[in-house]
From Swiss-Prot:
<dbReference type="InterPro" id="IPR018357">
    <property type="entry name" value="Hexapep_transf_CS"/>
</dbReference>
<feature type="binding site">
    <location>
        <position position="375"/>
    </location>
    <ligand>
        <name>UDP-N-acetyl-alpha-D-glucosamine</name>
    </ligand>
</feature>
<feature type="binding site">
    <location>
        <begin position="9"/>
        <end position="12"/>
    </location>
    <ligand>
        <name>UDP-N-acetyl-alpha-D-glucosamine</name>
    </ligand>
</feature>
<dbReference type="InterPro" id="IPR029044">
    <property type="entry name" value="Nucleotide-diphossugar_trans"/>
</dbReference>
<feature type="binding site">
    <location>
        <position position="403"/>
    </location>
    <ligand>
        <name>acetyl-CoA</name>
    </ligand>
</feature>
<feature type="binding site">
    <location>
        <position position="438"/>
    </location>
    <ligand>
        <name>acetyl-CoA</name>
    </ligand>
</feature>
<feature type="binding site">
    <location>
        <position position="225"/>
    </location>
    <ligand>
        <name>Mg(2+)</name>
    </ligand>
</feature>
<feature type="region of interest" description="Pyrophosphorylase">
    <location>
        <begin position="1"/>
        <end position="227"/>
    </location>
</feature>
<dbReference type="GO" id="GO:0005737">
    <property type="term" value="C:cytoplasm"/>
</dbReference>
<comment type="similarity">
    <text>In the C-terminal section; belongs to the transferase hexapeptide repeat family.</text>
</comment>
<keyword id="KW-0963">Cytoplasm</keyword>
<dbReference type="GO" id="GO:0009252">
    <property type="term" value="P:peptidoglycan biosynthetic process"/>
</dbReference>
<comment type="pathway">
    <text>Nucleotide-sugar biosynthesis; UDP-N-acetyl-alpha-D-glucosamine biosynthesis; N-acetyl-alpha-D-glucosamine 1-phosphate from alpha-D-glucosamine 6-phosphate (route II): step 2/2.</text>
</comment>
<feature type="binding site">
    <location>
        <position position="364"/>
    </location>
    <ligand>
        <name>UDP-N-acetyl-alpha-D-glucosamine</name>
    </ligand>
</feature>
<feature type="binding site">
    <location>
        <begin position="101"/>
        <end position="103"/>
    </location>
    <ligand>
        <name>UDP-N-acetyl-alpha-D-glucosamine</name>
    </ligand>
</feature>
<keyword id="KW-0677">Repeat</keyword>
<comment type="pathway">
    <text>Nucleotide-sugar biosynthesis; UDP-N-acetyl-alpha-D-glucosamine biosynthesis; UDP-N-acetyl-alpha-D-glucosamine from N-acetyl-alpha-D-glucosamine 1-phosphate: step 1/1.</text>
</comment>
Length: 453
């Protein structure tokens, strides 16, 4: 039986989160918890992913619109068994069904593969964990290695309370067996709900085997009910990411002060200072230094690049030997060639900066092409927007643009041109021309400053 489908329970409200956002949409590492679980299901090559939803239906569908899930509505939240009953009509007899939870985001593909491999024919494989303090959790009762029951804390006798192995709620069985047991569930309990733990007893009644597989990492099966638990899982996840990067050769000034909210690939001798955030897909070359407080999102950084503190780079490409920052911003579409310098309080948007060119201070370069070996002075602005449309500025090679100049697009400045400081350029400039529109300087001798009356 190789076919596999996954059911993800995500209908709960999450009252203890004190939020209008459904609990499963709260984020770990910049991604909704339920999206972590969906991604893990994809890694298992699940034929179908059934998502049980209820509270916050519109928000869930909005956030997960692109996900390949079968939406299964649970109008009332009447327990885990009731949630599985909603998905049961979609189960095929000959497929394995894995039951997961949208608020248990760190469950791994490897743990689930181990669980699936241990499932007995027509029986159940149940994921469990040992806790130093199992108070409040359902105890796993075994006889001769087989799980015979899950006993809740309030129903356990003194001997059962000594058991430290508890139920995580994650289980796998075949579709036919699940449908059979789900049809036999009842809600004869104090809460009036249908519980999946009762399936264990039903399997035993049918003479079928229930095996327990213990999770190696407690945090994989930790659920989230409040923001403290969310924060604890966030820190655990970040520690695991940093450990992998450290072992792969990345240097961190302080591993506890780094956040990875996506995917990071890197070359050799990469050094990352404190409070750096990586989002989306980021690729770093060799000998890259990232200063304190930088944010990088969906960008490619080549070899020998220095990114000084508090720079923000998004959807951009940076060439070899570039220097960026401090306090630089590269917006989507920014492309820096090799040996470029972009300095403090410079913003580059949808613009290409040629080899060896410098934009060192207090400038905005948008919708532009800057040639090789240009010098863009402090306070230069490409005026690319007329209130309705965007226009482009084209600058050739070896151009010098003096400080506090405005380049009003559409505009072409040919190679070798010089723009004097304080110039507003509104017409195209030819090769090797000097353009200056500065008001003539006046000197007034013996000037008396106004005095207060």
């Amino acid at each position: 039986m190789n076919k596999l489908s996954v059911v993800i329970l995500a209908a709960g409200k999450g009252t203890r989160m004190y939020s209008d956002l459904p609990k499963v949409l709260h984020k770990i590492a910049g991604k909704p918890m339920v999206k972590h679980v969906i991604d893990t299901a994809k890694k298992l090559s699940a034929a179908q992913i059934h998502l049980i939803y209820g509270h916050g239906a519109d928000l869930l569908k909005q956030h997960l619109a692109d996900e390949p899930v079968n939406w299964v509505f649970q109008s009332e939240q009447l327990g885990t068994g009731h949630a599985m009953q909603q998905a049961a009509p979609f189960f095929q007899d000959d497929e394995n069904i894995v039951m997961l939870y949208g608020d248990v985001p760190l469950i791994s593909k490897e743990t689930l593969e181990c669980l699936i491999s241990q499932k007995p024919e027509n029986g159940i494989a149940l994921l469990t964990v040992n806790l130093d303090n199992p108070t409040g959790y359902g105890r796993v009762i075994r006889e001769n290695g087989t799980v015979t029951a899950i006993v809740e804390q309030k129903d356990a006798n003194p001997e059962q309370l000594k058991i430290t192995e508890v139920n995580t709620g994650v289980m796998v069985s075949d579709g036919a067996s699940f449908r059979k047991w789900l049809a036999r569930l009842d809600n004869n309990n104090a809460q009036g709900e249908y519980y999946m733990t009762d399936v264990i007893g039903l399997a035993n009644q049918d003479g079928l085997k229930v095996v327990a597989v213990q999770a190696k990492d407690l945090m994989e099966v930790e659920g989230v009910n409040n923001r403290l638990q969310l924060a604890n899982l966030e820190r655990h996840f970040q520690r695991k990411q940093v450990e992998k990067l450290l072992l792969a050769g990345v240097t961190f000034a302080d591993p506890a002060r780094f956040d990875l909210r996506g995917e990071l690939t890197h070359g050799k001798d990469v050094e990352i200072d404190i409070n750096v955030i990586i989002e989306g897909t980021v690729r770093l070359g060799n000998n890259v230094f990232i200063g304190a407080g930088c944010v990088l999102k969906n960008c490619t950084i080549a070899d020998n690049v220095e990114i000084k503190p508090y720079s923000v780079i998004e959807d951009a490409i940076v060439g070899n030997n570039a220097k960026i920052g401090p306090f630089s911003r590269l917006r989507p579409g920014a492309e820096l060639s090799e040996n470029t310098h972009v300095g403090n309080f410079v913003e580059i948007k949808k613009a290409q900066i040629g080899k060896g060119s410098k934009v060192n201070h207090l400038s905005y370069i948008g919708d532009a092409e800057v040639g090789h070996h240009c010098n863009i002075g402090a306070g230069v602005i490409t005026c690319n927007y007329d209130g309705a449309n965007k226009f482009k500025t084209l600058i050739g090679d070896n151009v010098f643009v003096g400080s506090d100049s405005q380049l009003v697009a559409p505009l072409t400045i040919a190679s070798g041109a010089t723009i004097g400081a304080g110039t507003t350029v509104t017409k195209d400039v030819q090769e090797n021309e000097l353009v200056i529109t500065r008001v003539p300087q006046r000197h007034i001798s013996n000037w008396q400053r106004p005095k207060r009356k």
